Regions:
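Short, hydrophobic/aromatic-enriched beta-strand segments in well-ordered soluble domains
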Residues: 1-5, 151-155, 236
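Short, exposed beta-strand/loop patches in secreted or surface proteins that constitute
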Residues: 17-18, 25-27, 133, 137-144, ...
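Short, surface-exposed beta-strand/loop "edge" segments at domain boundaries and coil↔beta transitions
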Residues: 42-44, 157-164, 226-231, 243
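Active-site cradle of extracellular carbohydrate-active enzymes
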Residues: 111-157
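Solvent-exposed N-terminal domain segments of exported/luminal and surface proteins
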Residues: 4-127
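Polysaccharide-binding surfaces and accessory modules of carbohydrate-active proteins
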Residues: 189-245
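Acidic, contiguous internal or C-terminal segments within carbohydrate-active enzymes
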Residues: 140-144, 149-194
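A mature extracytoplasmic/lumenal domain signature
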Residues: 38-40, 153-157, 198-202
Length: 246
C-alpha cells in the first residue's frame, strides 16, 4: 500500500436547509432535486408534508443554490412590487425572468404538493385516514456530497389512536446517478403496529397510473403545473412486501 493524494470529484449530490425560504430542506443530484417543508412554514399556519421536486436538464452540476438565490433576491422583488403599482403585466413578466417556476435552461419547480404525500412520501394510516405530521421539526445533514446526500428529519409529536407522542424520523439518501431517494422511516412511542401508506399525489386522476403490489412498485405520469412544462414520470419501489396497491 502506497500513500497517495485523493482525486478531486465534482459535486453531484448536495443540499442544505434554506432558512431564507421558510426552512426548506432542499437537496439534489445530477438528475433531479427535492425539498421538504420546514418549521418556519408550519409556524405561518401552512401545511406541507410530501416532497416537492425540481426537474433538471442540460447540466449535471448543482443548481438549487442559484435557483433559490434568484427566486429570493430582494432587489428583484422590490422592482416587481413597484411595477405592480402601475403595470401588473410588466411585473408578471419580470417575475418570469427569475422565478424557479420557469425553466431558464437548467430545470424548474413545476410540481404542486400542498397537504398531500407529494412525490412518494410515507405516512401512518388509521381507518383509511392518513395521519400527517406536516412539516419537519428538526434536520441533520449526515452526508453532503460529493456523490451522496443524506439528511435525517424528525417531525413533531402527534396523537395516533391511544398514543399521544408518536414521533416520525425519516432518513433520506440521494446518490448521484439516481432519480430515486432511498428513505427509511421509523416511529417512536408507537405501541401498536399500524399500516404505512406511500403515495404520489394525483394531479390528473385519469392519468397513467400503475400500482403493482406483487411487483412492489407504483408509477404515475404527472401533468405538471402547466401545459408547456411537459410531464414528470413519478415512481416508488419497495424492498418490503406490499399488502395492497391502488
Amino acid at each position: 500500500v502506497q500513500a497517495g493524494a485523493p482525486v478531486d470529484v465534482e459535486v453531484r449530490a448536495c443540499g442544505r436547509q434554506y432558512p431564507e425560504r421558510l426552512d426548506d430542506m432542499a437537496w439534489e443530484n445530477d438528475l433531479v432535486g427535492f425539498r421538504a417543508y420546514g418549521p418556519a412554514l408550519q409556524a405561518r399556519g401552512e401545511r406541507g408534508f410530501g416532497y416537492d421536486l425540481f426537474t433538471k436538464r442540460g447540466t449535471a452540476a448543482p443548481v438549487l443554490e442559484d435557483m433559490y438565490a434568484k427566486e429570493l433576491d430582494a432587489d428583484s422583488w422590490k422592482q416587481v412590487n413597484e411595477l405592480r403599482k402601475t403595470d401588473p403585466k410588466a411585473a408578471d413578466e419580470l417575475v418570469r425572468t427569475f422565478s424557479y417556476h420557469i425553466d431558464h435552461g437548467y430545470g424548474m419547480d413545476c410540481y404542486a404538493v400542498g397537504p398531500t404525500l407529494g412525490a412518494g412520501v410515507s405516512a401512518l394510516m388509521v381507518n383509511d385516514t392518513i395521519i400527517y405530521p406536516w412539516c419537519y421539526k428538526t434536520q441533520e445533514v449526515l452526508d453532503n456530497g460529493p456523490l451522496r446526500f443524506t439528511v435525517k428529519l424528525e417531525f413533531n409529536p402527534l396523537a395516533v389512536k391511544g398514543d399521544t407522542a408518536v414521533v416520525e424520523t425519516r432518513l433520506i439518501t440521494l446518490d448521484a446517478g439516481s432519480h430515486l431517494n432511498r428513505t427509511a422511516v421509523s416511529y417512536s412511542n408507537l405501541k401498536e403496529s399500524l399500516p404505512i401508506v406511500t403515495g404520489i399525489v394525483l394531479h390528473e386522476p385519469d392519468g397513467a397510473v400503475v400500482a403493482d403490489a406483487a411487483g412492489g412498485y407504483m408509477t404515475y405520469v404527472d401533468p405538471t403545473t402547466g401545459p408547456d412544462n411537459g410531464k414528470i414520470f413519478m415512481g416508488a419501489a419497495f424492498p418490503a412486501v406490499v399488502k395492497e396497491a391502488k
